[in-house]
Amino acid sequence: MIEADRLIAPDNPVFKDEDVIDRAIRPKALADYQGQDHVRGQMEIFIKAAQMRNEALDHLLIFGPPGLGKTTLANIVANEMDVNIRTTSGPVLEKAGDLAALLTNLEENDVLFIDEIHRLSPVVEEVLYPAMEDYQLDIMIGEGPAARSIKIDLPPFTLIGATTRAGSLTSPLRDRFGITQRLEYYKVEDLQNIVQRSADCLGLSMESQGALEVARRARGTPRIANRLLRRVRDYAEVKGDGHICPEVADKALNMLDVDAKGFDYMDRKLLLAIMEKFGGGPVGIDNMAAAIGEERDTIEDVLEPYLIQQGYLQRTPRGRIATDRAYLHFGIDKPSNR
């Protein structure tokens, strides 16, 4: 797996120790939530309406690529509603009892946040349906012929589910969410604002153009932007006086092998393999995985999304194709037969 050594992988477990810093710089209110204007505008209305009616917010599904702020948005919703939030994830809820324990401890209008909700087991999902729809918990007591079902009334609550794979949710679960929000990759100017805000929270001396340099290479992802900012800070403190200007940011990011487009060595390895080994494509995913020594799932879930979104790679029925933009980026002449 490449996650362990990729600085720009959105879900890199190596950087879990930096979660404390992430929480410190994470916005707490919608007013501080940068970018995703359509989401912010809609949520302001939905939250205000729920507050005016003094009721729980409708169940909310948030989906999109990793690192775009799904957890941040869930916490903001709880803060704006002035309620408690309990956080868990799909893989952790192995048994129906695990979910029941969480649900029965919720107070009125509280938020239950389930990350990776697409990984819920069918047994747990079945328990969730009546809880979401009727605020009731159906539990089986006993086994065999003596088994009986009891119903437990739950207080009104808001379930917030987050996923990178909305298509993997079952239709019955997806249809029970009253609000659905898709998070998109961030514009550079929004990321620049996020980097500048994070620098201020960390007490860093940073020029706006320095923040822009970090934002340009952050792959449209706030989590990556904040991670790069911390590494640029390290470089500025060791190699200079701690002040981050565009030149310092550029040198630090080049040292990290993150180029002007936010590509690291794995992105370049993938695109170059298609162009140099397969004549630009089309090439099947399994052949591509073998060529670069990576797993199919890693290529599809980690490497490809950003390259496709930025127009450097195309998925076609016949396989993957490197685009004209990819050839231009690397300064390679496109084969005459393409």
Curated annotation (Swiss-Prot):
Mg(2+) binds at T71. One of its GO terms (molecular function) is four-way junction DNA binding. InterPro entries: AAA+_ATPase, AAA_lid_4, DNA_helicase_Holl-junc_RuvB, P-loop_NTPase, RuvB-like_N, RuvB_C, WH-like_DNA-bd_sf, WH_DNA-bd_sf. Residues 187-257 are annotated as: Small ATPAse domain (RuvB-S). DNA binds at R296, R315, R320. It is found in: Cytoplasm. NCBIfam families: PRK00080.1, ruvB. This is Holliday junction branch migration complex subunit RuvB. It comes from Vibrio atlanticus (strain LGP32) (Vibrio splendidus (strain Mel32)).
